[in-house]
Amino acid sequence: MHLLPEIIESAPEIQDIRRNIHAHPELRFEENRTADLVAEALSSWGITVFRGMGKTGVVGRLDGELGPGKMIGLRADMDALPLQEHNNFAHASRNPGKMHACGHDGHTAMLLGAAQYLSNHRDFKGSVIFIFQPAEEGGAGAREMIKDGLFEQFPCDAVFGLHNWPGLAEGDFGVTAGPMMASSNTFEITVTGKGGHAALPH
């Protein structure tokens, strides 16, 4: 896979951001430090920042210099999991019982990398909306952002997200139209009948 020299050049900075987020994981709707980091980075690149959607969500808007056009959303999640990290590298979690075990630190850093690149290359029509979602892990953060008017304020023509996938070879991308990954849901059933032994159900 061919990477632009500018992307390679910015990789250490984006890696530092990822490690910073990894070392300070925050659970759903508690992503205040992460949201501050995201907002500060976007602002420093001249991207307009909107806070408060979905409680701790952050949205950045970048308008192209070639006039009106499509509005494209790029989305990443920011929350960590309630797990104890047992790694011993320098950027291991400093928050007991919290860990970025699903790669949202990477997702957030990658989207910031895309934002940084596009902020330096505004020769496009339309707008890019950078959506940093809280509470993906069982907190319905996307629903909360939508309830707070995300797509009324930013009527995107399309929204793209990604998830890291260690099973794919480095440099490969898996793409599909529509939903791709299953969600975990709970439900209850009631069975009416007589009790008995499993070996003698009759």
What residue spans do the PLM features occupy?
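Histidine/acidic-residue-rich, glycine-tolerant segments that coordinate divalent metal ions
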Residues: 81-83, 87-99, 106, 124-202
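Acidic/His- and Gly-rich active-site-bordering loop/insert found
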Residues: 1-100, 109-112, 116-124
